Amino acid sequence: MLALVCSCLLLAALPADTWSGPAAVELGSDTVEQIRDTHAKVTEIWQALTQQRAAQGEPAGALHAVCRVQPSATLDAAQPRVSGLVVFRQLGPGAQLEAFFDLEGFPVEANLSSRAIHVHQFGDLSQGCDSTGAHYNPLAVQHPQHPGDFGNFAVRDGRLWKYRSGLAASLAGPHSIVGRAVVVHAGEDDLGRGGNAASVENGNAGPRLACCVVGASGPAPWARQAQEHAERKKRRRESECKAA
């Protein structure tokens, strides 16, 4: 990449007659000095960019995406209005995907409940979450082996907050989920064990409460969620120490 940038800048910087005529291969001292200056500037820029990513704790090839969850436009008045954020990070093409799920607006129930979250085929929200299509299934396999079958998430006091790693989906390559929809369902995923056709298609997860379209992003949304994750772990440890 650095060599490519250098080449482009050099082509733009050198006079036109440098590349024509019998003496095209002979560079004067001024031109050589100009090449050295350009190389030094490009190297400085590249090092600054690399150091910036390193300071953020991110490798240069890390990929990020964000999905801002909103209630489906087709919900009945009695259904809950779920909203929030899903942020993704992949340290490079071929690396495993990880995500933070931060959602609220679920009913506050006495017992812990679980809700299914899946990636659906289309990023089309023109008819709410109903127009996102079926599960994204590029390899034509049965549920729950779809790349975006994220499974069930525990809801406590009307909120869902979870970090998950090792997800099968990807932000890169021919099966990227960027531009597709994340859908939050009203029910629990039976993980293909329901004994009917719907079970191996969608896990009998029920109506679609909320959804969003996955979009590429910078590292900032991930950094904020990672900070909250670290603070939660710290509070949990402190609570355990006090209880002991």
Swiss-Prot record:
GO terms for molecular function: copper ion binding; superoxide dismutase activity. Glycans are attached at residue 111. GO terms for cellular component: collagen-containing extracellular matrix; extracellular region; Golgi apparatus. Keywords: Antioxidant, Copper, Disulfide bond, Glycoprotein, Golgi apparatus, Metal-binding, Oxidoreductase, Secreted, Signal, Zinc. Zn(2+) binds at residues 135, 143, 146, 149. It is an enzyme of class 1 (oxidoreductase). Residues 1-18 form the signal peptide. The keyword Disulfide bond applies. Protect the extracellular space from toxic effect of reactive oxygen intermediates by converting superoxide radicals into hydrogen peroxide and oxygen. Belongs to the Cu-Zn superoxide dismutase family. This is Extracellular superoxide dismutase [Cu-Zn]. It comes from Oryctolagus cuniculus. The gene is SOD3.
